[in-house]
Design a protein with these regions (language model features):
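Alpha/beta-hydrolase
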Residues: 145, 149-224
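Catalytic active-site module of serine/aspartate enzymes centered on a nucleophile-bearing elbow/loop
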Residues: 258-294
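Conserved acidic catalytic loop of the alpha/beta-hydrolase fold
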Residues: 75-93
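Conserved HGGG/HGGXW glycine-rich cap/lid loop of the alpha/beta-hydrolase fold
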Residues: 14-66
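Conserved alpha/beta-hydrolase "acid-adjacent" motif
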Residues: 242-248
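Short beta-strand/loop motif that positions the catalytic acidic residue
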Residues: 229, 235-237, 241
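Conserved hydrolase catalytic core segment
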Residues: 91-134
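Flexible "cap/lid" loop of the alpha/beta hydrolase fold
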Residues: 118-157
Length: 294
């Protein structure tokens, strides 16, 4: 595994903790909910091996990155723009994964001159204004996410789940893969990476400012809106994703003119495993290279 040390940047908006690893196409990566940039580095080794330079800031509230304006995808995008300026990068491919989808889309909307292309993978894109946008089986809990008085309850449940997943990583694998679980439960690579992911998730659950900020974004941010993004866009989503319903991918495609939706059969929310992983990664790399020619 290609590893890297955390770096820190002090800006007018606060501290950014980030990873800058690899050489090649500059790729600004917005990690998912529940774990920080270390989880993205764990899962995205294929990008590093395909000549991508991964720049992965911890999003607001995760580890040492400043929380800033609660529930603001714009604040996250602004921090990322400051990071690119510091690194003297004038254009980058932007990737948003899972809960990082809304901040990535916000970056592409607010900083089109910095965005060569956008990849939304298993990504949240629509505000949680109806139960259908929430993870499978959680639609009835929308009220809890809308009112801060219930935050302690959500935080407790998240920590409880993280502890269970760390004790038995197979629980985490089942939760994230949904009905794809029978297809990947005996995948040794998946088992090893999910065990490590469960450890990272447990760490973040103990200091949940970033997770709580993500919940606020999901219920309060506009997400992807009609015709707000103009760059080449690839949307990658497993049709059986149990955590981010496929509706999010269809919504993104309907809003972003000329976008391409790659509906895959992978590992549910875990697009890095399963039947279509190699196909997905080949298509993803081809898209990135086309949008950022040498």
């Amino acid at each position: 595994m290609i590893a890297a040390a955390e770096r820190y940047l002090e800006t007018r908006n606060g501290t950014i903790q980030y990873l800058d690893v690899g050489t090649g196409i500059p790729t600004l990566y917005f990690h998912g909910t529940g774990a920080g940039n270390d989880a993205a580095l764990l899962l995205e080794q294929p990008l590093l091996k395909s000549n991508c330079r991964l720049i992965i800031p911890n999003r607001p509230g995760y580890y040492s990155t400043t929380l800033g304006r609660r529930g603001s995808a714009n604040f996250c995008a602004d921090l990322a723009a400051e990071l690119l300026s510091h690194l003297m990068i004038t254009r980058a491919v932007v990737i948003g994964t899972s809960g990082g989808g809304m901040p990535a889309a916000c970056f592409a909307k607010c900083y089109p001159h910095l965005t060569a292309s956008l990849v939304l993978q298993c990504a949240q894109s629509h505000r949680w204004d109806e139960g259908k946008w929430l993870p499978q089986g959680l639609g009835h809990a929308l009220l809890l996410f809308r009112h801060r008085i219930f935050t302690f309850l959500l935080r407790w449940q998240n920590a409880r789940h993280a502890k269970a997943s760390q004790r038995q990583p197979i629980t985490c694998l089942r939760h994230m893969s949904g009905r794809r679980f029978p297809e990947i439960y005996d995948d040794l690579n998946a088992a090893q990476q999910i065990a490590e992911l469960a450890n990272l998730t447990l760490i973040c659950s103990a200091a949940p400012a970033g997770i709580q900020n993500d919940w606020a974004i999901m219920v309060g941010d506009n997400g992807v809106t009609q015709n707000s993004i103009r760059c080449p866009t690839l949307i990658i989503h497993d049709r059986a994703d149990p955590l981010v319903p496929f509706l999010h991918a269809e919504w993104s495609q309907s809003c972003i003119i000329g976008s391409h939706l790659l509906g895959i059969h992978a590992g549910g929310h875990l697009i890095w495993f399963g039947k279509d992983f190699e196909f997905m990664n080949t298509e993803r790399i081809a898209f990135i290279r086309k949008s950022f020619p040498a």
